């Protein structure tokens, strides 16, 4: 049996793989705390002001590709997740898959192409650390961004064979960003951060904190 990320929901993942949503996890707490320690430069603040201005002017009519091209992509590029020294990179729509045994001991092939993926590897992804899913509107009629993101995170966790190590994720619905962490069979979702407000600083600091965390994991 097989299931694509686009067909996965939180309910499906909970019922079939025993995943459980909790209020918080050490991985998310540490991520937030590390982000609060980061100070942004004047240049970064100027960049963010430009990105935010474009977002405010266009959020109601941008399609998914335009949102990614003009706002999400530049945000990730400013953090610069390409790191040859620590051997990890940011990839887009690269296929990942694995087989996972469900609660009935049936082997399920989970597969898909996350909108974004940070993993070891330079030319192609190897061991994932972070999965990203983007949705243009707050809620699409088909698909569930949080379910898609979590299913990709579950695949990453299985590939790495380190269930105790936090797997990180993020899904964006329009202007709102949500951060996720999966540890073992427990996962949590942060509050939403509105990129058209001062929350943009929080979002950017979370991305920078993620980079530092991945550098530590790959040292």
Predicted segments with their positions:
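A short, conserved, highly charged catalytic patch centered on acidic carboxylates
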Residues: 2, 13, 20-21, 27-32, ...
């Amino acid at each position: 049996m097989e299931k694509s990320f686009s067909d996965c929901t939180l309910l499906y993942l909970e019922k079939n793989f025993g995943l459980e949503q909790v209020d918080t996890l050490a991985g998310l707490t540490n991520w937030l705390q590390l982000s609060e320690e980061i100070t942004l430069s004047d240049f970064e603040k100027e960049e963010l002001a430009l990105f935010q201005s474009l977002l405010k002017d266009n959020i109601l009519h941008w399609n998914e590709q335009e949102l990614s091209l003009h706002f999400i992509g530049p945000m990730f590029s400013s953090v610069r997740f390409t790191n040859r020294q620590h051997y990890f990179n940011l990839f887009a729509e690269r296929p990942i898959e694995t087989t996972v045994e469900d609660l009935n001991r049936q082997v399920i092939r989970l597969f898909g192409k996350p909108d974004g993926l940070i993993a070891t590897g330079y030319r192609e992804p190897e061991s994932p650390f972070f999965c990203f899913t983007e949705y243009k509107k707050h809620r699409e009629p088909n698909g569930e961004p949080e379910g898609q993101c979590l299913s990709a995170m579950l695949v990453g966790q299985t590939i790495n064979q380190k269930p105790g190590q936090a797997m990180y994720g993020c899904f964006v619905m329009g202007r709102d960003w949500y951060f996720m962490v999966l540890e073992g069979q427990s996962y949590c979702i942060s509050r939403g951060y509105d990129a058209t407000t001062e929350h943009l600083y929080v979002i950017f600091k979370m991305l920078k904190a993620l980079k530092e965390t991945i550098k530590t994991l790959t040292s």
